[in-house]
């Protein structure tokens, strides 16, 4: 099938992660994404290793980090400091449907490449700015990074054990969510352009996105006025829904209703816990969380993990293992869903560059570009020819 975004032209003036992530998702969906990189050095993340992808000549062709967010793009080197470079970028913008940038607020204005400067000559352009704090407000001028957003957006205070320190989530979630929300905003703006014929400005921010995904914890506070506390691997609103010890490791048990709780107790041979009126519903189980979890944990700790999971599965109780990353990519479900990519590359010593596809399937088509991440300036001559600048 033709890719959903085939024919869409995207100009990416972004580096690091949030902006490039948005560009990669659009590329996976079929857009032609041109990544404009600083002459000589390119995206900073090209050097964020090890590990690096080894090239055919023994030198590396970019860090694993860079390759995680730049699949499917074409790269052109450009010097924004020169008038010639700025002219080329403006020419590329004029033929693009979407522009993504993640400079600090006002950072592109000095080059005449901000939305206000480009809009008159590119009236149909969807211009998306990705920043730490957004285009306005008391923090707008500050630089923003994922770790800061996780902290300032409340996620770190909610993550970790109750008696431990606030904890960063193990992936750059604020960057990634902002990239995904940017794609949502861009697609909404493109739909609006079909109606009006005009482009528009999309403003996304790391802290905004982090606050947005506080989800139930945000509403727990806004409704009750009580500040949520860290509860480790448990759930703020559901009991039992957490990690339990087993005789040989740990298992996740995620009961979502009273019936599943009763089945969990039956698997453990603890009918008395299922019948106890203090635990008959989630309100009671929340009230008596500490005592109940202590009793359940003592029982799960006697069972081997796989035996517990097998019995829970047979009873229809949601449960699962805690996988490390190697186990993730060896998991039969992940393999079946073809999440891992191996993209042919003449530049890589192994002949291919690995990746992880965008998790969208449309009528059986899995969203993924066939093109690996580009070498710095790999497509400069090709792109210049396309705009009559060769």
Locate predicted features.
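Aromatic-enriched alpha-helical interface/lid elements that frame and gate functional surfaces
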Residues: 239-315, 319
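Conserved PLP cofactor-binding pocket of PLP-dependent enzymes
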Residues: 313-337
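Glycine-rich beta-alpha junction loops
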Residues: 40, 133-134, 206-211, 248-250, ...
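Oxidoreductase and adenylate-handling cofactor-binding alpha/beta cores
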Residues: 179-199, 212-224, 265-272
């Amino acid at each position: 099938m033709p890719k959903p975004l085939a024919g869409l032209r995207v100009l990416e003036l972004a580096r690091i992660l949030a902006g490039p992530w948005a560009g990669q998702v659009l590329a996976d969906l079929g857009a032609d994404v041109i990544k404009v990189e600083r002459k000589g050095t390119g995206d900073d993340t090209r050097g964020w290793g090890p590990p690096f992808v080894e090239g055919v000549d023994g030198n590396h062709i970019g860090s694993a980090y860079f390759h995680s967010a730049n699949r499917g793009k074409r790269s052109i080197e450009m010097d924004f400091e020169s008038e010639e470079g700025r002219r080329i970028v403006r020419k590329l913008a004029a033929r693009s449907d979407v522009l993504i940038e993640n400079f600090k607020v006002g950072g592109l204005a000095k080059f005449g490449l901000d939305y206000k400067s480009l809009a008159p000559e590119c009236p149909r352009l969807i211009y998306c700015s990705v920043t730490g704090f957004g285009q306005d407000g008391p923090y707008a001028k500050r630089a923003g990074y994922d770790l800061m957003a996780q902290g300032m957006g409340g996620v770190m205070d909610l993550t970790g054990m109750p008696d431990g320190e606030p904890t960063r989530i193990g992936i750059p979630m604020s960057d990634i969510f902002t990239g995904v929300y940017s794609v949502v905003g861009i697609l909404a703006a493109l739909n609006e352009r079909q109606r009006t014929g005009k482009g528009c400005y999309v403003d996304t921010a790391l802290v905004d996105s982090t606050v947005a995904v506080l989800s139930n914890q945000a509403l727990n506070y806004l409704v009750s006025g009580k500040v949520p506390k860290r509860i480790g691997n448990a759930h703020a609103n559901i009991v039992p829904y957490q990690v339990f010890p087993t005789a040989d490791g740990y298992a996740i048990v995620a009961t979502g209703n009273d019936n599943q709780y009763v089945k969990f107790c039956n698997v453990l041979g603890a009918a008395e816990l299922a019948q106890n009126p203090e635990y008959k519903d989630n309100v009671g189980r929340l009230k008596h969380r500490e005592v109940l979890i202590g009793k359940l944990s003592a029982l799960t700790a006697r069972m081997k993990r796989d035996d517990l999971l097998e019995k829970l599965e047979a009873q229809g109780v949601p449960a699962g293992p805690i996988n490390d990353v190697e186990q993730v990519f060896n998991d039969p479900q992940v393999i079946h869903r073809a999440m891992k990519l191996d993209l042919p590359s003449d530049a890589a010593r192994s002949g291919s560059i690995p990746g992880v596809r965008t998790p969208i399937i449309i009528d059986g088509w899995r969203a993924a570009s066939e093109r690996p991440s580009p070498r710095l300036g790999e497509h400069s001559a090709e792109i210049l020819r396309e705009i009559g600048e060769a």
